[in-house]
Amino acid sequence: MNNEKNVSFEFIGSTNEVDEIKVMACYAAGSICGEKRGYCSSDPGRYCPWQVVCYESRKICAKNAAKMRMNVTKNTI
């Protein structure tokens, strides 16, 4: 265990359980992305871990995660 900070964040999920699991995995990847703290989301309509994008602030992350959620359809697995 190195000197890693625990990053807490509000979970932005969707009404689809499968989506929530995938988005949560994306956030987990974001917390270890790069050498600085990262907040994670993915490109609109894409899921992590294939498309991981890290942001420097929670505000940017929340904005992009909300955008992603709007673009993801429930029949995507």
Curated annotation (Swiss-Prot):
Tagged with keyword Transmembrane: no
Record's GO cellular component terms: extracellular region
Organism: Ambrosia psilostachya (Western ragweed)
Keyword annotations of the record: Allergen, Disulfide bond, Secreted, Signal
InterPro entries: Amb_V_allergen, Amb_V_allergen_sf
Cellular compartments annotated: Secreted
Secretion signal, residue range per the UniProt entry: 1-22
Disulfide bonds: C26-C61, C33-C48, C40-C54
Name of the featured protein: Pollen allergen Amb p 5b
Pfam families according to UniProt: Ragweed_pollen
